[in-house]
Amino acid sequence: MKATANRPLRVLHVLDSLAPGGLENGVVNTARRLHGRGFDIHAACLRFRGDFAERMPDPGKVVVLGKNAGFSPGAVRRLRTHLRATGADLLHSHNLGTLIYAAAATFGGRTIPIVHGEHGQLQPQDLTPKRLLQRRLLFRLCRRLHAVSAGLRDHLRDHGLDSGGRILATPNGVDSLRFRMAADAAAAKAALGFQPDDLVVGIVGRLVALKRHRLLFEALEKLAGELPTLRLLVVGDGGAERDELVAAMRAHPQAGRIVWAGHRNDLENCYPAMDLLAAPSEIEGLSNAVLEAMACAVPVLAHQACGNAEVIDRHRSGYLADLRDAAGLANELRAALGDPGELRRRGAEARRIVLERYSMEAMEACYRELYRGAVRA
């Protein structure tokens, strides 16, 4: 069934789940911008539903396919049936796992066109000849391909996955009305249990190894004697390392300086309590947390991974470094936190950049053209 002047274009997202995370947040933000404005947005979760399903514009249009461990032919059949039932005009998969199911359910994109998105750098297990060939072959079945930053697009190209120049960069956007500079930073700190003069370094994300929380915990231990007001604010929950990381926080020699806020739906109240956001992950495509912090005029110390490097100017709007170990991270934190005036100046410039280049309106326009182009092709 094709979209017409009288019927919106129907898009079905295929995800592992809608559990809280950066990828999922991007899907929700895009869906909320497009649904009811020329588009009808649905979602199918392979394994389970997830809390972010309730943030979708119509939670009733989120289904679970009941994928078992390993490859699940039953999930393919259920996805194929759901595609027919919804009358979807195109299917939007996210990262390799969901693309496998999208390709199988649509007979290689022949019954319904596939739009596919990549959201993070390839990991060692993705770089084997077999995995690279698998991605290359599956990419050929897609009507449109996109990556969430130009740096990620170039990263995929460097690994031979974009020989035809087909991958488009579709940067994430941030709601700059929701995420804004704190009217009262001291009050924001107090609400989370900090003192007004505490130096608060935050980290936001699921409790998984790829976010590299442990590196930040080690850096705190190294800096504890030098910076008596240094505190950590850890925002996020869930993930494969949740229990281990919670135990590590509780057993940390400086446990009294760590506030674990868990999963929060009011992140706009968390960033203003921070003097600096740490983003030591090495795999970010374009981190939602980085953009949200910048919109709140909070400067970011980030690993020079592909997406971060195009968002942060290391001399004006934040701090970029090769954060390969705790000693390096501690050195960068020491330098950044040692000049509060410079932190404020870089935070203000960070917000200006977000307003200029990473608006929700710009993101919406990217996806409108991506979807319309896929149907026209």
Predicted regions and their residues:
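A conserved mid-protein helix/loop that constitutes part of the nucleotide-sugar donor-binding site
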Residues: 21-29, 199, 203-222, 240-244, ...
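Short hydrophobic beta-strand element within catalytic cores of glycosyltransferases
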Residues: 45, 299-302, 312
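Short His-centered aromatic/hydrophobic patch
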Residues: 93-99, 118
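A short, active-site helix/loop in glycosyltransferases that binds the activated sugar's phosphate group
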Residues: 142-169, 174-178
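A short helix/loop element that forms part of the nucleotide-sugar donor recognition site in Leloir-type
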Residues: 180-194, 247, 347, 366
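A short, well-ordered alpha-helix in the C-terminal region of glycosyltransferases
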Residues: 190, 328, 335, 342-357, ...
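Aromatic "clamp/platform" in nucleotide-sugar-dependent glycosyltransferases that forms part
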Residues: 263, 282
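Conserved acidic donor-binding segment of nucleotide-sugar-dependent glycosyltransferases
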Residues: 313-315, 319-326, 335-341
